[in-house]
Amino acid sequence: MLLLAFGNITDFRTNEMFVQHVLAMDTTNFGQAAGQGLDADIMWRAVRSPVLQTATYCLIIAWEALSGAVLLVSVWQWLTGRTSQARATSTVGLLMVILQFFGGFIVVGGEWFQMWRSTQWTGTEVAFRCSVLALFTLIFVQFGRILPDGQRETGQ
């Protein structure tokens, strides 16, 4: 997540354009030219303000940086043997990742802003992969709570 935030900061314009097109809903027309063949029944959802689009992108980057920092702390906790703390911190960080990719990109971007209808500016497949990876990691982290002999972890 920290690398993702770093990439979005150092190559700000590329992904800002992505966010702008998704929020503006100007390519939700199944591959037609931008602005053509748009569904008038849903275009009221579009956010056309460049200020709001950029603010949204900055919030995404901030969320990525924060979730990355939480996960980095959890890695340090795992490495220093603070198992219970690491599990709790990992859970928070992974839930933040799931909230961003599933809640933010698939639900809000994909469904509310109809990102799935765009042939050029859709990120639903990538968001799905990231959501599933974070979910499986979360499950793996939580399964470690019960030791093989059935005893509960005592941890620090």
Describe the predicted segments one by one:
Residues 8, 12, 41-44, 54:
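Generic structural signal for short, flexible, solvent-exposed coil/loop and linker residues
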Residues 20-51:
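Extracytosolic (periplasmic/ER-lumenal) interhelical loops and adjacent juxtamembrane/interface segments
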Residues 1-22:
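N-terminal signal-anchor transmembrane alpha helix
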Residues 1-7, 54-60, 66-156:
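Extended, low-polarity transmembrane helix blocks
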